[in-house]
Structure formats: structure tokens, C-alpha cells
Amino acid sequence: MPRQRKIDLFNCDQLYELRVIEDLLNSSKPMLHDKLGFDFTVEHHYFSLTEMDELSEKVIPALKMDFAIFVVHAKESRLSINDGRGYTKVYRALMKATGKNSKRLQQCYLVIGADDNYKNEEEEEQSFISPWARRIVCVQFNEEYLDGRKSFVFSWGEKHRQIHVEALMHFF
């Protein structure tokens, strides 16, 4: 019988549809079940800027989750995820919460949705993050948080691609 896992999705101000992320997860569900022996449920969490402190300090620590995916929109004025400003409190709370109940630490991914900064279709198909998005976030994260050793940062235009499914399987 497959182990049941819980994956929580987070987005501020409903700037990106979490259903798109759930589509990525659902497309990998048969492989996760067959190859890794686990199934999952998904819960959506939208929050406002004014709720970030409470979310980070009270809500997230109380959640029982195995994995978290934090989703931001590429066109947000500032993609400040892990540099001490912006979404830092939320992201770090997710990293802490997903590490407390597992042997592996910090099981939180970052998705940058609506990223139309790929050079061409070939680059988009072969990369799980655009060069533009990598430049934006690379100063905020060590390489192992970008390349799958500890986490992943994905970006895509309208929806995920096969490379994202493969990367997700690698990480799980």
C-alpha cells in the first residue's frame, strides 16, 4: 500500500493559479505511485501581504505537510524570496516546517510562474528554469537549492513541461 504524503501549495494575493501546480503534481502521480510507492493529497493556501507574519509564525508551523511548493508570479515587482526581505519569512517557515517530520530536510520547491523570458522554444523545453529567473534567484540561494540536491527552483510560461516532471521525480 502506498504511503500517503501531503503537499501544500502557497501563493500570495492569488497572483498565480495553484491549479497549474496541481496539474504538474497530478501528471507525476502515476510515476510517484509506481516507482516510489507514495500517493499524495494537495492543499491550496492563498494569503495576502498583511497575513504573511501570521502565516509564517502560526499557520505554517501548525500544518502537517511533507512537501511545500511556494509559487510566485514572474511579473511581481520584486522576486525577493530568500534575501531577508519580501517573502523570506514565508519561504524560511516552509523550509523549517517541511524538514521537521522527515529524514530529509527542507522539502520546499519554488515555482516562478508566467516566466516568458526564455530565448526560444528549444531553451524552454530543455531548461527547468529560464536564464532570467536563474539570474534573479541565484544570488538568494546556494547552488544545491537550485539544482535538485536540496531543492529546486522551477520556472515556466503557462504550464509545466516534461523536464519539470523529470526534475520532480529526481527530487522525490
Provide a role label for each language-model segment:
Residues 1-172:
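Conserved GTPase G-domain substructure that encodes guanine base recognition and part of the catalytic core
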